[in-house]
Amino acid sequence: WDPLEEIIIGTADYANIPIPNISVMKCQFPEYEEEYVRKHTGFYPQQIIDEQNEDLDILSETLGKLGVVVHRPNTQYANSPCYSPNWNGKNWHYHCPRDLTLIIGNKIIETPSPIWNRQFETWAYREVFSKLYEEGYDWIKAPIPILHDENYKEDTRGVPALNNEEILFEAANCVRVNEDILYQVSNTGNEKGGQWLQRTLGSNYKVHITEDLYSYAHLDSTIVPVKEGLVVYNASRVTLENEPEMFKSWDKIWIEECANIENAPFGLPWGASEWIGMNFLSVNSQLAIVDKKQAMPIKFKNGKR
């Protein structure tokens, strides 16, 4: 709950839709046919990339004016192939530094994504991590997964896509609240990943594994802690029956819907979640940066209408 001091803001440079493979189809596009995805592979339209970079630059400048140290990714390898003895692909994007990096106490943890195309994504942040390591942080990388086909369920409709074969999860499957970490089993994290995280962190932290909130991917459009004692819930996914025990005594803000956005511009077949408006960035316990179109969360300034 301390004020934000340092952050990595991503970039839209080289953002693309990857050529379909089992990991992309099972974890990212389970509702689409492979041939449909294949028709739309390649870089996003340049206008989307330029407009998003403009927004990210403004966000970076805003945070800098608030006294936050801002880092940006090194895109040297962004347009490069990535491969292992078991698979090959191409690096995806550097939109989301949060997705694959956990900062817990003085530990930097690079997490093992189940998606082929994300295995080298954290290379973009190595300079930042190296600096923090020199300052005394512990720097941990989870075991590099083989990502054989047995990791992915045959039928993923409405259920998490991953079997419990390897340690697989993304950092954005987690929400940390003091010494408690809520861990979501989904298309981007299996139970074994939560077990590994608990063993790695030891007895100073408690990892709470949940499977009944949202099976698609990350937690940050489902549950967002604002400050100690106040949490935002996605009302379409969280109920009083399935809410995590760690939040039962907290005040709740229930978001019934987000403002409409142009979900799939330029004729693209998909876009952001309809709940993307729940993504906001807390600078301190009294200040959050919110999409200006999202009147619903803005109404609840300081937890009140």
Task: Annotate each PLM feature.
Residues W1-R305:
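The feature marks the mature, well-folded catalytic cores of soluble enzymes
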